[in-house]
Regions:
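Short amphipathic alpha-helical segments
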Residues: 149-152, 220, 273-276
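Structured beta-strand-rich core segments of catalytic domains in phosphoester-bond hydrolases
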Residues: 75-97, 123-127, 135-217, 321-325
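Active-site beta-strand/loop signature of hydrolases that rely on acidic residues for catalysis
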Residues: 101-107, 121-147, 195, 205-209, ...
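Acidic/histidine-rich helix-loop elements
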Residues: 104-120, 215-238
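Short, solvent-exposed loop/turn segments at secondary-structure boundaries
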Residues: 113-119, 183-184, 297-300, 323
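N-terminal, active-site-proximal structural segment of metallo-dependent hydrolase catalytic domains
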Residues: 1-150, 247, 340-341
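Active-site environment of divalent metal-dependent phosphoester hydrolases
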Residues: 109-113, 143-147, 163-166, 189, ...
């Protein structure tokens, strides 16, 4: 740092801090949240930390300074461990007579509390689903709204609870459902539900997983006034709950004898412990066939992917689409799969 100006020394000092924090974030998915519960919040900030390190790298590159090596090596390590946060390749789209489409969508109770200041959001969601025509629809924060008619799906399983407003999870299917159930999580309305569907000669299990929410208000004026210590403690407690919920789900899943598709809102990113554990040897449909950031949540500061569709290796991932439909605080995603005859 001897040959750096005072300003560049300050910038490089900041560069070191951001690189070290990002490196630490890369290690967190390999440790249970109960070990570093509060620090696990860094998982949510990985896209931001990556962006900062890209900017540092470009800054030093334009000056032809060797300080670029720090962020370059950090970013390369992250790429080797997790892949890129942005997929530059075009979305894969393979047509096949065996194709079927699976959509995941957290509908936020069909806007029953008017979070979005528009009329008929529930009808717009129904119209959107009808237009995109998934064969299987996985919904989190489902509410049996009087104006919601999804009868174009022949089969469904819903699990709802609540006194004043009933809500929960639901799976709709154009294929026959022969079995269904719920994996209950303690002390929360969140859960995981499943259905076994028959498609041709195959029986497929589809899970819909909704892990504990951080309950963070993304409005800037609210975040500015919220106590940071209380926010971190709440996040740490949430990550511990997510770990327990993940363990309960995986215990149920390992008893399944069918090929599996896992959909859900994990309320955590692809750099988290719960993502790594649930994904395990499954394929992330976005990584296989998507493009761009794959944003699934309306966070104001940077693109966040917290909703996922996974499938075991028996399924070919023939397509993936992230939608920019502003009908909830989440964005819908849909994957196209195929099973060989």
């Amino acid at each position: 740092m001897k040959n750096l100006s005072f300003i560049n020394k300050l910038i490089y000092s900041a560069n070191i801090i951001f690189a070290l924090v990002l490196l630490f974030s890369f290690a967190l998915p390999f440790f249970p949240p109960k070990t570093f519960s509060i620090l696990s919040v860094l998982n949510l900030g990985v896209p931001f930390l990556v962006l900062c390190n890209v900017l540092f790298f470009l800054y030093w590159l334009f000056q032809l300074r060797k300080q670029l090596i720090l962020s370059l090596l950090t970013l390369c390590l992250g790429y080797l461990m997790f892949g890129s946060i942005y997929k530059f390749s075009a979305s894969k789209k393979i047509e096949s007579p065996n194709n079927f489409k699976v959509m995941n969508f957290n509908v936020r109770l069909f806007n029953v509390y008017d979070w979005i200041p528009e009329n008929n959001i529930e009808s717009k969601i129904v119209d959107f689903v009808k237009t995109e025509a998934p064969d299987i629809l996985s919904i989190q924060e489902y509410h049996p709204h009087k104006n919601v008619n999804l009868s174009f799906f022949k089969y469904k399983y819903e699990h709802v609870s609540g006194k004043k407003i009933k809500y929960g999870q639901a799976i709709f299917s154009k294929y026959r459902i022969i079995n269904s159930g719920s994996v209950e999580f303690p002390n929360t309305p969140n859960n995981a539900i499943f259905v076994d569907i028959v498609k041709g000669k195959d029986t497929i299990r589809v899970y819909n997983v909704h892990l504990e929410s951080l309950r963070i208000n993304t409005r800037i004026e609210v975040l500015k006034t919220e106590d940071s210590e209380r926010l971190l403690k709440r996040a740490g407690s949430t990550f511990k709950m997510q770990q327990l919920q993940t363990e309960l789900f995986l215990e149920h899943k390992k008893k399944c004898k069918y090929r599996v598709i896992v959909c859900g809102d994990f309320n955590n990113t692809a750099y988290s412990y719960v993502y790594r554990k649930i994904k395990s040897d499954l394929n992330d449909a976005f990584k296989e066939a998507g493009n761009g950031f794959g944003r699934t949540y309306d966070f104001k500061f940077f693109p966040v992917r917290i909703d996922f569709i996974f499938a075991d290796e028996a399924f070919k991932v023939n397509g993936f689409k992230s939608y920019n439909a502003h009908l909830s605080d989440h964005y819908p995603i849909m994957s196209t799969f195929a099973l060989d005859d």
